[in-house]
From Swiss-Prot:
Subunit structure: Forms a complex composed of sart-3, terminal uridylyltransferase usip-1 and U6 snRNA; complex formation is mediated by usip-1 and sart-3 binding to U6 snRNA.
Domain PAP-associated: 384-437
Stated name of the protein: U6 snRNA-specific terminal uridylyltransferase
Enzyme Commission (EC) number: 2.7.7.52
Database matches in Gene3D superfamilies: 1.10.1410.10, Beta Polymerase, domain 2
Length: 662
C-alpha cells in the first residue's frame, strides 16, 4: 500500500466539507478557488491542512467545487450550519458548504468530485480502493440510530410473536458488503429452546385477520407463523404496528406486497437521514441469498479482498450512472429501472464463472461451503483488467435471446420451457438460490438499453491508453469527451491538384496497424473498399508510395450492422466477436459508387506514428470520415486485444460469410 493510500485509510472525512458555487450566479467576477479559501479564513473559520484542499480540475466549468479540510469536526459542522442559516456569497455568487460525509454517506456527486481531486495522487488500483474506503465510511450517529431502531423493532416483534428471533441479513450484516448507506434487512422466525413444549394449535386465520390486536394478549405461535401465508402475517403485523403510537412517532411504515412481502420502517426522527428496515417473516431463502453473496466475497483469497472492492465499485458505478437510485432525494430516479444491487452482483458472479469456465458457486451445498476458494489476482491481475473483461463479456452478450443460468448463458425459450414456463423478460437472470425465479423479470426494456449503452461506453474508456478508473463514474459523459478528443487524429485539408480542388484526410493509425498489408486488408475486408478496376496493379506495396492506390467505395459497410451481427451470433455460436465483426462486413453487397479515393500510407520521420493519407477524388467528406471513424473507433477499438495479440493479418484467416447465412 502506498503512503498516500495509508493516509486516506486513516483520514476522518467528518472534518472535510464541500464548497460549491456556480459561474452563472452573477455577472460580476466569478470567485476563484483561492478567493473562496481567503473568504473562509477571513470570516474566522479554521482550516486544517491546506495541502489537502482539492480544487475543481476544470475551472472553466459552470459548476465549481472545492473540498476543504477543517481544523476539527466541530468546525466542519459549524461552517455547514452557517452556510444554511446565514448564507455566504462572494461578489454576489452564492457559496454553499455541505459535509463530505453526509447523513447517508457520500453523495454521488461528492464522491465523483472527491475522486477527481484524488486522481493525480494514485494509480488506478489505488483510486478504486480510495473510493471504496470513502463510501464505506458512516456517521457514528447514523449507526446508533440504526441499532436503536433495530432494538425497538425487535422488542415490538417479541410482543406479537412467541419466542421471536430477529435476524439481520443483507449488506449491513456483512462486514465485506456494508457501506455508509446500508439499510437493515430483518427476518423474523419463532425459535424454541431445546426441550420447550411448542403449541401445535393454529387459530383460524380469519379470526386473527378480523382482530389483529389479539396478538397483544395471544402472540402468533411458531405453528401459526409456519402455517399462515407470509403476506397475511405481514399484513397482520403491519396493522398492529400502524396502530401503535410509539411506532408511529418513530417510523413511517408501509406494507409492500411482493414475492417476499415486507413491512418497510423508515426512521423519521432525524430529518434528512434515510434509515429504513425491511421486515419479513419466515424468509430463510433471502437470508441464504445474502449469505451466498457474502461467501462469494470472503472466498476470494487475494490480498486486500479485491473482489469485495470490485463488487462494491460496480454497484456504486450503477448508482452514479443512474441505473440504481442513490440515497439522497436528488439522487432518486425519475423513472425506475427495476434493477437492484442483488441483480448487479449476480451479473458479476455469472461473469466470473463464465470467464474462468469454472463453476465457483454451488448454491445447493451447505452454508459456508457453497463457493470454492479463488484468487482475484490470479484470475484477473488488476481491477482495470477485471472491468475490461467484465464489460467486454456483456458488450458481446445477446440480452435479446439469452438468459443467465448460473455459469451458463442459454436460450430464453429453452430455459422458460425447462422450468415450467418462467416468464421471459428483456433481462433474464435466474436466481441461483431459486432456479424457478427470474430475479430480473421486472427490469424494463429501457433499462436494458441504458445498461447496454453504459457497458459499451465503459469498455471504450477502459481501452484507452491513458485514463483514470473514476472516469467510469461518469461513463457516458467521459466516453463522449474521449471520443471528441480523438477526432483531431483525423484532420481535413483542401489542396489543388492538376487544377482541381481536392479534399484530403490525414488519419493517425492505431498501433496495431503496422504494415501497408494491414491497412489494405482493413480497407478491403472490413470497409469493403474495392480496388479501382482501372488501376494498374496495385500490389499492396503501392500503399507505401506517394501515389498509393485508388479505391472505389461501393457499399456502406459501417452503417446498420447491429441486426446483422445479432443474426450471426444466433446462427453461429462458435464465432468469436472478431470473427462476427469481420463476417458482418461480408454481408454488405456492392451498390452504386459512393466515393473514389486515393489512399497512401507513411510513417512520421523519427517516430512510430503511421498515417493514412486519403485523397477524396470523388464523394462526400462526411461519408469517408464516418467510414474511418467506424474502422478506428469501433472495429479496431472493440477488437483491439485480439488484433494486438494475433496481428491484423489474422483477419485474412477468417472465412468469408456464406450468402445463405443470416
Amino acid at each position: 500500500m502506498s503512503s498516500n493510500l495509508q493516509l486516506v485509510e486513516t483520514f476522518d472525512s467528518r472534518q472535510f466539507v464541500v464548497a460549491r458555487w456556480n459561474r452563472n450566479d452573477t455577472t460580476a467576477m466569478v470567485p476563484s478557488a483561492i478567493a473562496v479559501v481567503v473568504f473562509v479564513e477571513s470570516v474566522e473559520y479554521k482550516l486544517g491542512c491546506k495541502e489537502k484542499i482539492g480544487y475543481s480540475p476544470t475551472p472553466e466549468d459552470q459548476d465549481q467545487f472545492m473540498i476543504l479540510q477543517m481544523e476539527s469536526i466541530d468546525e466542519a459542522n459549524r461552517i455547514c450550519h452557517d452556510s444554511i442559516a446565514k448564507g455566504f456569497a462572494i461578489n454576489n455568487t452564492k457559496i454553499v458548504f455541505t459535509p463530505l460525509l453526509g447523513l447517508n454517506g457520500f453523495r454521488l456527486q461528492d464522491a465523483i468530485d472527491f475522486m477527481k481531486t484524488s486522481q493525480p495522487h494514485f494509480n488506478n488500483d489505488e483510486l478504486l480502493e480510495v473510493l471504496t474506503m470513502a463510501i464505506c465510511q458512516e456517521l457514528p450517529e447514523r449507526l446508533k440510530i440504526l441499532e436503536d431502531g433495530f432494538s425497538f423493532i425487535e422488542q415490538g416483534v417479541s410482543e406479537l410473536i412467541q419466542n421471536s428471533a430477529c435476524e439481520m441479513f443483507g449488506s449491513f450484516a456483512s462486514p465485506v458488503r456494508r457501506n455508509g448507506y446500508s439499510d437493515i434487512d430483518i427476518n423474523v422466525e419463532s425459535v424454541s429452546a431445546p426441550g420447550q413444549r411448542v403449541s401445535t394449535n393454529v387459530r383460524p386465520l380469519n379470526e386473527v385477520v378480523a382482530n389483529p390486536k389479539c396478538l397483544i394478549t395471544h402472540p402468533l405461535t411458531k405453528s401459526e407463523l409456519e402455517t399462515y401465508p407470509q403476506e397475511e402475517i405481514i399484513k397482520i403485523l403491519y396493522r398492529c404496528f400502524n396502530e401503535n403510537s410509539a411506532f408511529k412517532t418513530k417510523f413511517e411504515m408501509r406494507f409492500l406486497p411482493a414475492r417476499t412481502p415486507i413491512i418497510v420502517f423508515k426512521n423519521i426522527e432525524v430529518e434528512g437521514m434515510n434509515v429504513s428496515y425491511d421486515l419479513s417473516v419466515h424468509n430463510q431463502i433471502s437470508v441464504e441469498k445474502a449469505s451466498l453473496l457474502h461467501e462469494f466475497i470472503v472466498k476470494d483469497k487475494s490480498k486486500g479482498s479485491r473482489m469485495k472492492n470490485a463488487m462494491m465499485f460496480i454497484v456504486h458505478w450503477a448508482k452514479s450512472n443512474k441505473l440504481l437510485s442513490g440515497d439522497y432525494p436528488e439522487e432518486k430516479l425519475e423513472v425506475k429501472t427495476k434493477l437492484n444491487s442483488y441483480i448487479i452482483n449476480q451479473l458479476v458472479i455469472h461473469f466470473v464463472q463464465a470467464a474462468t469456465n469454472k463453476v465457483h458457486v454451488n448454491p445447493q451445498a451447505k452454508r459456508d461451503s457453497r463457493v470454492n476458494e479463488y484468487n482475484f489476482d490470479t484470475l484477473f491481475g488488476d481491477y482495470c483488467k477485471f472491468f475490461r473483461e467484465l464489460f467486454k463479456y456483456y458488450a458481446n452478450f445477446d440480452f435479446t435471446n439469452k438468459a443467465i443460468y448460473g455459469k451458463k448463458a442459454m436460450q430464453k425459450k429453452t430455459l422458460s420451457s425447462a422450468h415450467g414456463g418462467v416468464e421471459e423478460s428483456p433481462l433474464m437472470l435466474m436466481d441461483p438460490m431459486d432456479i424457478t425465479h427470474n430475479i430480473s423479470a421486472k427490469v424494463t426494456e429501457d433499462a436494458v438499453k441504458l445498461l447496454n449503452g453504459l457497458i459499451r461506453n465503459a469498455l471504450f474508456i477502459l481501452k484507452q491508453n491513458h485514463f483514470h478508473i473514476n472516469y467510469l463514474l461518469e461513463t457516458n459523459t467521459m466516453a463522449t469527451m474521449l471520443m471528441k478528443s480523438r477526432e483531431p487524429k483525423i484532420s481535413i485539408s483542401t489542396r489543388v491538384t492538376d487544377g482541381a480542388e481536392h479534399q484530403y484526410l490525414s488519419v493517425q493509425l492505431p498501433a496495431v496497424v503496422i504494415t501497408s498489408s494491414d491497412l489494405f486488408l482493413l480497407l478491403t475486408r472490413v470497409l469493403r473498399f474495392n480496388v479501382c478496376p482501372n488501376e494498374q496493379g496495385p500490389s499492396v506495396v503501392d500503399l507505401c508510395t506517394p501515389t498509393g492506390a485508388i479505391f472505389l467505395v461501393t457499399s456502406r459497410a459501417w452503417v446498420g450492422r447491429r441486426n446483422t451481427k445479432r443474426a450471426l451470433k444466433n446462427s453461429r455460436h462458435d464465432l468469436t466477436p472478431l470473427q462476427i465483426d469481420v463476417m458482418c462486413s461480408d454481408k454488405y453487397d456492392y451498390e452504386e459508387d459512393i466515393a473514389e479515393l486515393r489512399i497512401s500510407m507513411s510513417t512520421v520521420p523519427g517516430t512510430r506514428i503511421r498515417l493514412a493519407c486519403i485523397d477524396i477524388m470523388r464523394g462526400q467528406v462526411s461519408e469517408v470520415r464516418d467510414a474511418i471513424h467506424f474502422l478506428i473507433d469501433q472495429f479496431i477499438n472493440n477488437n483491439y486485444d485480439d488484433l494486438e495479440k494475433n496481428g491484423v493479418q489474422t483477419i485474412s484467416r477468417i472465412p468469408i460469410a456464406a450468402p445463405t447465412w443470416p
